[in-house]
Every structure is written in structure tokens, then in C-alpha cells.
UniProtKB/Swiss-Prot annotation:
Organism: Homo sapiens
Disulfide links within the chain: C97-C189
Residues of this chain annotated as glycosylated in UniProt: N5, N19
Pfam families: 7tm_4
Membrane topology: Multi-pass membrane protein
The protein, known as: Olfactory receptor 2AG1
Gene behind this protein: OR2AG1
Amino acid sequence: MELWNFTLGSGFILVGILNDSGSPELLCATITILYLLALISNGLLLLAITMEARLHMPMYLLLGQLSLMDLLFTSVVTPKALADFLRRENTISFGGCALQMFLALTMGGAEDLLLAFMAYDRYVAICHPLTYMTLMSSRACWLMVATSWILASLSALIYTVYTMHYPFCRAQEIRHLLCEIPHLLKVACADTSRYELMVYVMGVTFLIPSLAAILASYTQILLTVLHMPSNEGRKKALVTCSSHLTVVGMFYGAATFMYVLPSSFHSTRQDNIISVFYTIVTPALNPLIYSLRNKEVMRALRRVLGKYMLPAHSTL
């Protein structure tokens, strides 16, 4: 089998779900709408959190970072997928593939850590309210944000460099929406079994501790909420936590399927559907899940829209 010729004009061929769909035009329109929804909803949420002084709190700072990650994640993948479909041109350069992989891994890894920190924030707020401002100071909050970005970036860099050092076979297609490790290794002209095992082990190591921390935090939160004397306080806590748990379930469900389940459980079609879910659907839904059930966020959005975007006579 002929090895990959690393020239400037060389590139992989990404055959994503749009190319394998029975109704590609309808799917393309749906993905376009979801992407626009992700841009608008995450953009508005970021604007509200940035401009509204009442939302300058740890909980909303972390939520703003989640929106930023979702916005960047979907923008790494979706515009190219749509442009490729419209141009009938599915190639991606070696460098472009490496960059896409690095950015996707960075956003995914950062979100994994950030969701754990968000769970800790809710745990402190509900279970230890008197010490909340001490434990979740501005410095501590920004340290959590920086930790998420730095650790995810370093991990993504190592994975990307090691994955792309393999020789790749000419005329092989990557039957996936984006350049991801499991699918790129399928076109490698070398024995990748040990590296695949390492990716699996590291995937478990990266995902499970964060998920365990989230579950432990919410177990303690649930026990505390059940003993709250105020029905209103109990309802508010449950609404906030249920929003976070919904996002956690969507993120970890997709990540576990892609990186933890053995390859025997995978099929090309399933992987493509899952990739659309976590790169396009989830970023579009996350801000809606948080904002529609959070009165503070909704009030802030109305104030920001009324002040900066709508005419002076707006009734918002």
C-alpha cells in the first residue's frame, strides 16, 4: 500500500454524514439552522454575562466559558462541513486536519474539566453557602478556567503530534465529519494498536474522574436539597442543577461513546451521528437549557437586548 506523499497539495478526504445521508439537502439545511442557533444563543449569552454586572459571579463566569467553548467547538467543524458539501469538495490538508484535531480536542477536554468545576461551584453554593465567596473567589474561579484551558491544550497538543507522526495511506478516505483520532488511525499505514490502547486508557482517565466528581457533587447537593425547609429554595436549586445535569448527560454520553466504548461497538454511521450531536446539536442546545430555565439570565438578556440591540421604544 502506497504511503502518504507529504506535499503541500496533499490532503485527506472527509466523508461526513452529509455525503452519506439519504436527504443531504434537508440535513444541510437543518445543520445550518442549528449552527446559526448555536452562534446566536451562545453569542447572546456571552454578551449578557459580559455586559450585565449582576451576572459577574463565579457561576455565570463559568457558564460564559462554557458558551465560549461551545461556540469555538462548533465553529471548528460546522462551517467547513457545510462549505465542503456546497462546493462538492471534501478535501482537507494535512496541516488543516492537524489543526482541526488540536482545536476539537482542546475544546472537548476543556469542557470536560469545566463541567466538573461547575458542579463544584454548585456544590459549594448549595451545601456551604456561608463560605461560598471564600471558596469560589474571583481568583479561584479564574484559576479553574485557566486550568481547564491549559491542561486541555497540552493534552490536545500531545495527542495531535503523536497521531500525525504516523505514515498515512494514499487514496484513503476518513469517513467522519471531522479529523478525530479513532478515524484517522484507520488510514494509518502502521501498527497503531498500542496507541489505540493508550488513547482508550487516557480517554477513561480523562473522563471518569471528572464524571465521578460531578456525580459525587450532585449526590451531596441532592441530599442537602431534600432537607431544605423552603420549597422555593428547593425548587430553585433543583432547576439550576437539573440544567447542569442535562448538559453533563449530553456531553459525557457522546464522549463515552466515541472514546471509551471499544471499537467493536462502533459503526461509521453511528459515529457520524454522534459527531453531529456533540459538535452541532449540543452547542446549540446548551445555552437554551441554561438560559430558558434561569430567571436571572433571562432578565439579563432582556435588559441587554433592550439597551444595546432594540429600539428605544422597545417594550422589553
